[in-house]
C-alpha cells in the first residue's frame, strides 16, 4: 500500500480550535522566523490501529503544525526550512508534529535523525500509541482491513512484527498511551491530561448578534430570538445608537422578561456546554437575533457573554450587522 506525505492546512483553523488555556500557537508574532532552540518536534507513532490519526487531530487542536506520513529523513530539511537555520526567513511555525509509522521510508534512520535534532538544540518529544494484541485484532476485524505488515500472513503475525520493530522507539518515548480500553473521547481526554497536564479546557464560546431581516445564521449551534423585547429603534433618542451604548443596553436589559430570559438561557447553555465538553466538542457558536441586529440582540449578546465569562468560560462576541444601520 503506497503512502503519501500530507501537510495539514492548519493555519487559523488550528488556532481557533485550540483550547483556550493550552498556551500554544502555530506561529510566532508577525510570522517571524523561529530560532532552533525555540523549535519543538513531536513524533506521533505507535501500533497501527492504536489511534495515531485521532491523536494527530488532537495535537493539531493543541496548536501543533501536523504532517502525516513523513519519512524520517525529511525531518531535518523540514525543520531547517521552518527555522532561521535555513537560507530563507523561516515559516513562523515553532511546533511541528509528524506522524510516522514503520511503513515510512527509511524508518531505520529515525534514531540518527533524532540524534541530529538533539545536536541542533531542537526539543524533540515522542508520543507512542499502543494497544493490546487482542484489541488490535478486534479493531482490524471490525474494519475488515489487513494490517500494513500482514503481507498475506495471519493478522497476528503483522501485529507482532510491528511491535518488534517499534520496541526501541517505545522505550525512548516521552508519553506512552495504551488505548485498549479507551473510546475516542476518552483518548482525547487522556491526551490533554498527558500532554498539557490537565483535562480538556472549557469549551470556547462565540456569541454573535444578528438581524433576522438579513437572514438566519447557518453556522450557529444555538439561536436565540429576542424580538419579544421592546424595540429601542422606536425610541427617538436611542434609534441612532446600538446595543453597545449604555443607554440602549440599560433600556433592553431592564425590559420586562429580559432578566428572566437571560437567567434561563444562561442555565441552559451551562448544561449544554458540560455535555459538549464530555463529547470532546471544543467550540460552540451562539447567535442572538432581533429584527435588524443593532439594539436588542447586541445588548443581550454582550450581557450573555458577561454572564458566561463569570463562570470562567472563554467567550468572544461579535455583531454580524455592525455595518448596517437604521433598523432594529
Swiss-Prot record:
Any one GO molecular function term: ATP binding
Keyword presence, Protein transport: no
Domain of life: Bacteria
Ranges annotated as biased composition (Low complexity): 13-29
InterPro entries, alphabetized: P-loop_NTPase, RapZ-like, RapZ-like_N, RapZ_C
Keywords of this entry: ATP-binding, GTP-binding, Nucleotide-binding
Residues holding GTP: 101-104
Positions annotated to bind ATP: 46-53
Disordered: region residues: 1-33
Cystine bridges: none
Known role: Displays ATPase and GTPase activities.
Homology family: Belongs to the RapZ-like family.
Protein name: Nucleotide-binding protein Blon_1085/BLIJ_1109
Highest classification ranks of the organism: Bacteria, Bacillati, Actinomycetota, Actinomycetes, Bifidobacteriales
Amino acid at each position: 500500500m503506497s503512502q503519501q506525505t500530507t501537510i495539514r492546512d492548519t493555519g487559523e483553523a488550528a488556532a481557533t480550535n485550540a483550547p483556550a488555556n493550552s498556551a500554544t500557537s502555530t506561529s510566532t508574532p508577525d510570522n517571524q522566523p523561529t530560532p532552533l532552540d525555540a523549535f519543538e518536534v513531536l513524533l506521533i507513532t505507535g501500533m497501527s490501529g492504536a489511534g495515531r490519526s485521532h491523536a494527530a487531530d488532537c495535537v493539531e487542536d493543541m496548536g501543533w503544525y501536523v504532517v502525516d506520513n513523513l519519512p524520517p529523513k525529511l525531518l531535518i530539511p523540514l525543520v531547517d526550512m521552518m527555522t532561521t537555520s535555513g537560507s530563507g526567513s523561516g515559516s513562523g511555525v515553532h511546533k511541528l508534529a509528524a506522524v510516522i509509522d514503520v511503513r515510512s521510508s527509511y524508518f531505520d534512520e529515525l534514531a540518527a535523525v533524532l540524534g541530529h535534532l538533539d545536536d541542533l538544540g531542537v526539543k524533540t518529544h515522542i508520543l507512542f500509541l499502543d494497544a493490546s494484541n487482542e484489541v488490535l485484532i478486534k479493531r482490524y476485524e471490525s474494519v475488515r482491513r489487513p494490517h500494513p505488515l500482514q503481507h498475506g500472513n495471519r493478522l497476528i503475525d503483522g501485529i507482532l512484527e510491528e511491535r518488534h520493530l517499534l520496541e526501541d522507539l517505545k522505550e525512548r518515548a516521552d508519553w506512552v498511551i495504551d488505548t485498549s480500553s479507551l473510546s475516542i473521547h476518552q483518548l482525547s481526554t487522556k491526551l490533554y491530561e498527558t500532554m498539557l497536564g490537565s483535562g480538556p479546557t472549557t469549551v470556547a464560546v462565540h456569541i454573535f448578534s444578528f438581524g433576522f431581516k438579513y437572514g438566519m445564521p447557518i453556522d450557529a449551534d444555538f439561536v436565540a430570538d429576542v424580538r419579544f423585547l421592546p424595540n429601542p429603534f422606536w425610541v427617538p433618542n436611542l434609534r441612532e445608537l446600538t446595543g453597545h451604548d449604555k443607554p440602549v443596553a440599560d433600556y433592553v436589559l431592564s425590559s420586562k422578561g429580559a432578566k428572566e430570559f437571560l437567567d434561563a438561557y444562561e442555565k441552559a447553555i451551562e448544561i449544554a456546554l458540560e455535555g459538549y465538553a464530555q463529547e470532546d466538542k471544543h467550540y460552540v457558536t451562539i447567535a442572538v437575533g432581533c429584527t435588524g441586529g443593532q439594539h436588542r440582540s447586541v445588548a443581550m449578546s454582550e450581557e450573555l457573554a458577561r454572564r458566561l465569562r463569570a463562570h470562567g468560560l472563554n467567550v468572544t462576541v461579535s455583531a454580524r450587522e455592525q455595518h448596517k444601520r437604521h433598523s432594529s
